[in-house]
Amino acid sequence: IRYFKSNSYYIPSKEEVQTYSKEQIKAVGEINEKCSDYTILTSPRLPQVETKSDSQIEELKQICRDGWKNILMPTGKVKDAKNIKIYKDRILQELDVIEDADLAGYFLIVADYVNEFRRRGVLVGPGRGSAAGCLISYLMAITLIDPIEYGLIFSRFFNSARKGSLPDIDIDFPPDQRENVITYLKEKYGHNRVCQMLTFGRLQGRSALKEVLRVNESCSFDQMNDITNKIPQEAAISDKLEEMDEPSVIRWALENDPDTLREYCWEEDGELQGDFAREFAQALRIEGTFKSQGKHAAGVVVSSIDLNNLCPMVKETRGNEKIAGMEMNDLEAIGAVKFDILGVNLLKKIHETCGAV
């Protein structure tokens, strides 16, 4: 009551609606007529990239030609007609997909900051994950791994069925250079158009069940650990969780490994049974809820417009820097573009070791 000026902020019952006056009902109709559909969802808002060519895709193709000459030819891999056809067919296949999905700008941005820091003498990672399966990335020196040589598949990285979404090129830098990369992007595309992003920690599997057991004081600390340790780690069954309509680590354990948990809880005729059935039911209900927030370890958001006009901005928990106050999928849905810039300590150690030899 202190904060609200009315006690009617709820969905009324049928009987209550029948008591409304004709004027009230008419007013609702007038409000409805003044409302219009709109959406904040949009395609990726990539910043404009300066090019020497007439278009971004032509710039990309020219870089690929240069990569053929300067990267592929010195290896001797494209001397005979058979290999030339293999590499050309793969390049044309990838270019068709990239052009159709309008991703040339994305590749140009990544290639720009990767090669800029290589020119500065920074040890940049040779390639991480599915991006190493893209021959275009190799020709642009984004990655240093030839996917043809190692039999890596482009469609695992990106394919025409994913049109409208963005690829995911993770780039590794020494930790002491990561902030320099972000500063470079801010200076190039605008300080108000580049920032890091928020991520939420969630109660999943073991942590959800442990929280319920702790709050309810259902058992000793040792027994709590014994029970929760019988729940598999999320990463260990991630592929299986993707097959579930509503992914749940606890539900998966109850259905697929019931004997391990039978001492504490089991399911019978759709109902949970056992000494800890109530706690398991509560844990299932809270699984997936947010428990904490922090700054994403790798994600950097870049946009063609002022981020203050695109998404909520929040202060990071350990500092005064403003970061995007939404998670990756939500940011991409409203047009922000995420680049993964990781700090890998091993790269720093390798660089220092090479300098000492």
PLM regions: where:
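Alpha-helical scaffold/interaction cores of sigma-54-like transcription cofactors
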Residues: 1-357
